[in-house]
Amino acid sequence: MIEAVDICVQRGKKQILKHVDLQAKNGAITVIIGPNGSGKSTFVKALSGEIPYSGKMTLNGHDVTQTKTSKMATMRAVLPQSTTLAFPFLVHEVVELGLSINKFTIAKKQFQNLPQKTLERVGLADYGHRLYHQLSGGEQARVQLARVLCQIWEPICNKIPRWMILDEPIASLDIQHQLVVMNIARNFAHRGGGVLAILHDLNLAAHYADKMILLKQGKVYCEGSASTVLTTQNLRDVYSCSLNVSELPQADIPFILPQTAQPLMK
């Protein structure tokens, strides 16, 4: 489980996160949504140990600030919003970083084919010897997902709870590969892993999320099922635009359509 209690993040004079409390459970997909600047990525950076914060954050019962980075790396893998790398890595070298973090070696029989298998899962089977920095943004995001899958090799999930932390994993992808990524996340959760994802596509979020957390101006505005969170009034209040929310036929899943492209006048 991921548990955050009274999390605050300050950047200069501006408070980015304001007393955030939230929980995300293993075996489920928890999706954080909210407008740009609401604190979504800041929360992920705090959870990843990239930025300081006040309050308490635990992952599988381990305090994020008190646990060695090497230990945390065995329990969670992060797909960051930016997938740019400064060095001229080959694609297979980027993917193999996931194995090195967990102190696995490519020479071990059970792991030697894992990087290639994960590239196949994300639709990049023939990309292993291409230069990473020459790929498109969407291709780089899929390579990073392959790295994440290597780092939290799924069959281990039932012995050591593992987490995927995904910061806008589908932002640069076409619809085909958006579904590939989200189905990988769903399968990972079904196998006992935990998924915490930031998404901007509210309709895909509604389809895949077991729990949704809506942020507004650094605070948790509401949380719960998609039907609870994605109401016309909630979205109007948080996003300041007119949206119509209905339900998909034969499914208890909200579906969102714009009523107008113009922002509400205040």
Swiss-Prot record:
Keywords: ATP-binding, Cell inner membrane, Cell membrane, Membrane, Nucleotide-binding, Translocase, Transport
EC number of this enzyme: 7.6.2.-
Topology with respect to the bilayer: Peripheral membrane protein
Protein residues bound to ATP: 34-41
GO cellular component: plasma membrane
Alphabetical list of PROSITE patterns matching this protein: ABC_TRANSPORTER_1, ABC_TRANSPORTER_2, HMUV
One annotated GO molecular function: ATP binding
Pfam families named in the record: ABC_tran
InterPro entries found in the cross-reference section: AAA+_ATPase (IPR003593), ABC_transporter-like_ATP-bd (IPR003439), ABC_transporter-like_CS (IPR017871), P-loop_NTPase (IPR027417)
Localization terms from the record: Cell inner membrane
ABC transporter domain boundaries: 2-242
Keyword Transport attributed: yes
Superkingdom as given in the UniProt entry: Bacteria
Family membership noted in the UniProt record: Belongs to the ABC transporter superfamily. Heme (hemin) importer (TC 3.A.1.14.5) family.
Subunit structure as annotated in this protein's UniProt entry: The complex is composed of two ATP-binding proteins (HmuV), two transmembrane proteins (HmuU) and a solute-binding protein (HmuT).
Physiological role: Part of the ABC transporter complex HmuTUV involved in hemin import. Responsible for energy coupling to the transport system.
Descriptive protein name: Hemin import ATP-binding protein HmuV
Organism name: Bartonella henselae (strain ATCC 49882 / DSM 28221 / CCUG 30454 / Houston 1)
Organismal lineage: Bacteria, Pseudomonadati, Pseudomonadota, Alphaproteobacteria, Hyphomicrobiales
